[in-house]
Curated annotation (Swiss-Prot):
Name of the protein in its database record: 12-alpha,13-alpha-dihydroxyfumitremorgin C prenyltransferase
Gene (UniProt): ftmPT2
Family annotation (CDD domains): PT-DMATS_CymD
Source organism (scientific name): Neosartorya fischeri (strain ATCC 1020 / DSM 3700 / CBS 544.65 / FGSC A1164 / JCM 1740 / NRRL 181 / WB 181) (Aspergillus fischerianus)
E.C. number(s) listed in UniProt: 2.5.1.110
Matches recorded under NCBIfam families: arom_pren_DMATS
Ranges that cross the membrane: none
Keywords annotated in UniProt: Alkaloid metabolism, Prenyltransferase, Transferase, Virulence
């Protein structure tokens, strides 16, 4: 007797298969599912994930992520009760597709009614709960590093009390201290955590850069000393964690939630000076990485993308605008630049990633630039279908 093990259904029925008898405790969760489910499915199809993986990814979204997305945003209605750090508009959910490695990813900040009502004023409960449930489903998710940085970078109960009692009204945005990401690959998942030390900085008086560097140092990994030294030297980070250039601001630490020996750390900054010279400095660590042929090749491609996008150079405000959901940003809005560096004991220099933010730019112009760049890379199939793919979402 043969037992079939493959799940088979027409692609258009994959969402309906899970939706037909789904139950949600409130309308917000139902609406999150109806919005995110089809979009995730389409992205998985575009990335050519096997159908059985598409269904399991959808099921994970429905059962484990949707319950932690909070109030569903509606254009023209009251602002969201919790303004997330994950996206420009404060929405706690972001889908993305890593084209180079063909990995679909969900970035999100787990929320609950406790955070939205102010009871959990710094949203410490939902991320912990959600991640613990994820770890129960997949034994490749290791929480050792997560626990370490929780202890180092989240406000303590005493610090939380002082912030609420002594610091006056806290800003609407920036109160979140943690975000998560789930990547779908090889038929399973991997997870990452992100720590925003802004509230810890406000409570302790220590700079975000100092808090992040101290938390890394407390891991006591000898192999990290050299890459951290090169990073600090290139960014001009002083003993107090402040860069000598005040336009640069450390603000975020990312960590892979896998076994500690494989876990990478990512150190994030924003830069208010947006220019090609700054991009080149960040990519090469002020020239230190140029001896690496991959660095030079990457710099050439970066220059090509920079020229194609025609991002206006200049100095940007670092004040986070209060965008209204569903409305475009002002025509004169220009975002800061972002970068991160991956710190690994196995590498002398940290590996950079540069974020050329296009919020506020014309979408058609950006798409034309990306199509031209994909052609430069030899990704002809993607170049020929990219605009139609984007328009279909």
């Amino acid at each position: 007797m043969t037992i079939a093990t493959e799940i088979s259904c027409p692609e258009e029925e994959a969402f309906q298969l899970l939706d037909k008898y789904s139950w949600f405790p409130n309308d917000d969760q139902r609406r999150w599912w109806e919005y995110t489910g089809p979009n995730l499915l389409k992205l998985l199809r575009d990335a050519q994930y096997p159908q059985k993986d598409q269904i399991s990814c959808l099921y994970l979204l429905q059962q484990l992520l949707v319950p932690y997305l909070g109030t569903f945003p509606v254009a023209g209605q009251a602002p969201l009760p919790w303004w997330s750090n994950v996206t420009t508009y404060g929405v706690p959910f972001e889908l993305s597709w890593n084209l180079l490695h063909n990995i679909v990813r969900i970035g999100f900040e787990p929320l609950s009614h406790l955070a939205e009502s102010g009871v959990d004023a710094f949203n410490k409960i939902a991320p912990e709960e959600c991640l613990s449930r994820l770890a129960c489903l997949d034994n490749t998710i290791d929480l050792a590093r997560f626990r370490h940085f929780q202890h180092q970078l989240l406000v303590t109960p005493d610090e939380e009390r002082r912030l609420l009692e002594e610091k006056g009204p806290l800003p609407k945005s920036g109160r979140g201290q943690q975000a998560l990401a789930v990547e779908f690959q090889n038929g399973g998942i991997s997870a990452k955590a992100y720590f925003f030390p802004g509230m810890k900085s406000l409570a302790t008086g220590l700079s975000p850069g100092k808090l992040i560097l101290d938390s890394i140092e407390s891991l006591a990994l000898p192999g990290l000393k050299e890459p951290v030294h090169h990073l600090c030297n290139s960014l001009g980070l002083q003993d107090d964690g402040h860069p000598t250039d005040t336009a640069i601001a450390p603000f975020l630490l990312g960590v892979d939630l896998c076994t500690p020996e494989r876990s990478r750390l990512k150190f994030y900054v924003t830069d208010q000076v947006v220019s090609w010279d700054r991009v080149a400095d960040m990519w090469t660590l002020r020239g230190k990485r140029l001896e690496d042929p991959q660095c030079a090749d990457g710099l050439t491609l970066l220059r090509k993308l920079w020229d194609l996008l025609e991002i206006p150079e200049g100095y940007r405000s670092n004040i986070r605008p209060d965008f209204a959901f569903g409305t475009p940003p002002p025509e004169d809005y220009r975002p800061v630049m972002m970068a991160n560096w991956t710190l690994s004991p196995k590498k002398k220099f940290p590996d950079p990633q540069i974020y050329l933010l296009t919020v506020g730019m014309n979408d058609a112009v950006v798409m034309d630039a990306l199509v031209a760049f994909y052609e430069v890379l030899g990704w002809t199939d993607l170049a020929s279908t990219y605009k139609d793919k984007v328009a279909s979402y």
